């Protein structure tokens, strides 16, 4: 079970870390709650995309053309929006 969890985490990490190379960048990744979406997820769309913090990104953890839109910064990832 632990191996499966590590494998799934590694696959998600690699998919999100390489997502900025894709043309359909907004369709890939994990949706997250932006401040503009409202106070809760109930009845609201999640308009942000979770980005893994990797080298080469700006100080906000988002790729070029995207901005930080979350309430607080994560340790491994940030919620970004185009």
UniProtKB/Swiss-Prot annotation:
- Which cysteines pair up through disulfides? They are 32-79, 34-69, 62-80
Q: What is its main location?
A: secreted
GO CC aspect terms: extracellular region; nematocyst
What the protein does comes down to:
Binds specifically to voltage-gated sodium channels (Nav), thereby delaying their inactivation during signal transduction. Causes death to crabs.
Q: What family does the database annotate?
A: Belongs to the sea anemone sodium channel inhibitory toxin family. Type I subfamily.
The record's annotation in Gene3D superfamilies points to: Anthopleurin-A
Q: Which residues form the propeptide?
A: 20-26
Stated name of the protein? Delta-actitoxin-Aeq2c
Q: Which InterPro entries match?
A: Myo_ane_neurotoxin_sf
Q: Which UniProt keywords apply?
A: Cleavage on pair of basic residues, Disulfide bond, Ion channel impairing toxin, Nematocyst, Neurotoxin, Secreted, Signal, Toxin, Voltage-gated sodium channel impairing toxin
Question: Where in the sequence is the signal peptide annotated?
Answer: 1-19
Compartments where located: Secreted; Nematocyst
Any GO molecular function: toxin activity
């Amino acid at each position: 079970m632990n191996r499966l969890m590590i494998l799934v985490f590694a696959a998600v990490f690699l998919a999100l870390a390489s997502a900025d190379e894709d043309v359909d960048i907004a369709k890939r990744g994990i949706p997250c709650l932006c401040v503009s979406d409202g106070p809760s997820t109930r009845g609201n769309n999640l308009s942000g995309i979770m980005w893994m913090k990797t080298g080469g990104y700006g100080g906000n953890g988002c790729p070029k053309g995207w901005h930080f839109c979350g309430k607080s910064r994560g340790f491994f990832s940030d919620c970004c929006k185009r």
